[in-house]
Amino acid sequence: MKISVEQLKQLNKEEYILIDIRDAEEAFKNPIENSIVLSGESVLSKEFDSTKKIIIVCAQGHVSDFVAQKLQEKGYDAYSVD
């Protein structure tokens, strides 16, 4: 599933976990407020609070789509930022 930046801004920060899977250099040069920086692989191996939406951000959207889909298959309410 996709979520727009505008939709994300409307959510209460307590409702979601924002995960930045861009490469570490890009993530630290241009940090996204309230995000956790992780690799796509490590996201798939972690456990998250299942009561929250999981929002995935990457540089172009392709990898975040894949990671969000895999998290959905594991039962999470996961989204890729469009």
Residue ranges of each PLM-predicted region?
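Glycine-rich nucleotide phosphate-binding loop and flanking beta-alpha elements
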Residues: E25, L44, H62-S64
